[in-house]
Amino acid sequence: LGRNKGAVMIAEESTAWPKVTGSPEDGGLGFSLKWNMGWMHDFTEYMKLDPYFRKNAHNMMTFASSYAYSENYILVLSHDEVVHLKCSMINKMPGLGFDKYANLKAGYAFMMGHPGKKLLFMGQEFAQLREWSEERELDWYLLAEPEHQAIQNWYRDLLHLYKKNKAMYELDNDPAGFEWVNADDCFRSIYSFIRHSKDNKKNLLFVLNFTPMERRDYRVGVPRRKQCRL
């Protein structure tokens, strides 16, 4: 499995069966990647919460880092999450109007920065309102609306950031590629972490605020004295 160059074998698997992405020579199943179902569940449940109550569920966004290297994972927001009355991604978000779109932007940024490859189901990159159905095309007309175009532009910018910076992907399966700066600021629902590159020269610092509260003069530490660019 997965021996042909350019071919990727991905397992949609939700049990604790070990070595799904391990080599067959070592008793594994030989898949290239495995869906991270635990991350998907925790992420969507957290994002649905009113920001006021997120402080009580802070660990839902940090728990996946404790097992992120047990397999070669892909972070998935699949068709399963936007059908059968589960709502589209934008309609999972709490609040009204601007708050919904701001929540979705923060969620997508967290997903892009988290270790693991990425898979987002079609339509969610421009905040499709209706659930997906195989009986109709996507609601492309929504892109005439500024808020939907803004989400598409945001996701495009995240993809460009991902492609441009090796720290976002080259150590996905190595604990050396990810470091929490502050995983415990539950009262303000802020997460900060660093993605490291192999040469440890072009690292990226993520600071994500999951409340609508503006935080002025928020201090973030870095692990060593280096020049940083915002």
Question: Predicted segment positions?
Answer:
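Segments forming glycine/polar-rich beta-alpha architectures that bind adenosine-containing cofactors
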Residues: 230
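A short acidic, glycine-rich active-site loop
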Residues: 96-98, 142-149
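Catalytic cores of secreted or luminal carbohydrate-active enzymes
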Residues: 146-172
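Conserved alpha/beta catalytic core and glycan-binding cleft of carbohydrate-active enzymes
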Residues: 1-134, 163-173, 177-227
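Active-site His/acidic residue clusters
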Residues: 132-142
